Curated annotation (Swiss-Prot):
GO cellular component: ribonucleoprotein complex; ribosome
GO biological process: translation
Record keyword Thylakoid present: no
HAMAP family named among the record's database cross-references: Ribosomal_uL10
Protein name: Large ribosomal subunit protein uL10
Function summary: Forms part of the ribosomal stalk, playing a central role in the interaction of the ribosome with GTP-bound translation factors.
Keyword Cytoplasm: no
Subunit (UniProt): Part of the ribosomal stalk of the 50S ribosomal subunit. The N-terminus interacts with L11 and the large rRNA to form the base of the stalk. The C-terminus forms an elongated spine to which L12 dimers bind in a sequential fashion forming a multimeric L10(L12)X complex.
InterPro entries the UniProt entry points to: Ribosomal_uL10 (IPR001790), Ribosomal_uL10-like_sf (IPR043141), Ribosomal_uL10_bac (IPR022973), Ribosomal_uL10_bac_type (IPR047865)
Pfam families named in the record: Ribosomal_L10 (PF00466)
Domain of life: Bacteria
Keyword terms of this UniProt record: Ribonucleoprotein, Ribosomal protein, RNA-binding, rRNA-binding
């Protein structure tokens, strides 16, 4: 019995660690998914530097209480519950799950935690519609690059006009001579 208790304590510690490190945590009900569906979903999470796991509800309850979460989160730990962790991009888990739910009706959002705040399934779906971190960085870089590019075009246009004007003056002087 001691080894089983130690194993459970390790699982609680692992879950607490993941819950603390993740920017986004989404709890789902997966009762209608096949093992093959779960494998595909895990692979998608791995590709996005995220994680998808199943924990026992009782162990998640212990870990959540130890981290200071109350019944507003723990009440969702009923029935088959899986957990998606997003470490780098807070939008990635929401995007993966909502996209996967379109083709797999057995997967349902229960509740989420985004940067320590408990969020509803509707808020998770809204989060999924936001651009990813990489997309936002690309847009920011593009908007910073645009004024510089425009300045280059304006300056090169001005220089080009100056060259044409000087060339015209040169040709006029040569024609007069």
């Amino acid at each position: 019995m001691g080894a089983s208790r130690e194993k459970k304590q390790q699982i609680v510690a692992e879950f607490k660690d993941k819950l603390s490190k993740a920017q986004t945590v989404i709890f789902t009900s997966f009762s209608g998914l096949t093992v093959e569906d779960e494998t595909v979903l895990r692979r998608k999470f791995k590709e996005a530097n995220s994680e998808y796991k199943v924990y026992k509800n009782t162990l998640m309850t212990i870990a959540a209480r130890e981290l200071g979460y109350g019944d507003d989160l723990i009440k969702y730990f009923e029935g088959p519950t899986s957990v998606a962790f997003g470490y780098e991009d807070p939008v990635a888990p929401a995007k993966i799950l909502t996209e996967f739910m379109k083709d797999h009706k057995g997967l349902e959002l229960k509740v989420g935690i985004v940067n320590g705040k408990i969020v509803s399934p509707q808020e998770i779906e809204a989060l999924a519609k936001l651009p990813s971190r990489e997309e936002l960085l690309a847009k920011a870089l593009g908007s910073m690059k645009a004024p510089i590019t425009n300045l280059v075009f304006v300056l090169s246009g001005t220089l080009r006009s100056l060259v044409y004007a000087l060339n015209a003056i040169k040709e006029k002087k040569q024609a007069e001579a």
